[in-house]
C-alpha cells in the first residue's frame, strides 16, 4: 500500500472531538512556511527521490503521456509543503488505488475513491481550523462543537460539493493476472475546500435555526 509520509503532517489525531495538529506537526508546518522556495524545492526533491525508488521497486510506472514518475512526485511534495499563515495547507491532498480489467476503468475508480478520501481530508483540516479558533479564544467550545458536528456529519455532502481536482500523480502497474492497478494522487485548492465545507456547515446550521455561520464568516473569512 502507498501512504503519504506522516512527517508532512497530513494525518491529524482526534482529541476531544477536535482534530488537533500535534506540536511536532505544527512546528514542522511553521518551519515550512518560513522556508524559502529553494529550500522547499530541495526538501521536496529529496523526499520524492526516496519514494520514487520505493515505487519503482514495487513495479509502478508513469502513465502514458504523463511526466516521469520522479517529476510527478516532486510536484506532489512541493504542493504538500505549502501552507498559509494559519498553517492551513494551500492544497488538500488525497490518493487512492484501484484495480480493473482495463486502464481507463481502474483510473476512473481510483479517481472517485481519491475524491472520497479528499472529502475526509477536508473534514480533518477544517476541523483543525475550527479548533484553532477555540484555542485563540475566538469561538466558544460549545459553538465549535456544533460546527464540528456539522462537518463530521457532512462528508458525503462535502464530497458532492468538490469541483475540479488537480491530478498530481498518475501511476500504474500490471498485476499477476494481467489486470491494471492505477494509483491517483490529487490536489484541491484550499479556498475551494473551505467553500465546500462552508456550504455543508451553513446548510446544517440553518436547518437547526442556528445563525452561528455568520460568526464563522467573520472569524474565518468564509
Predicted regions located by residue number:
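Domain-level marker for long, solvent-exposed, non-transmembrane regions
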Residues: 19-222
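Bacterial N-terminal signal peptides
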Residues: 3-13
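Positively charged n-region of N-terminal signal peptides that target proteins for export
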Residues: 1-3, 19
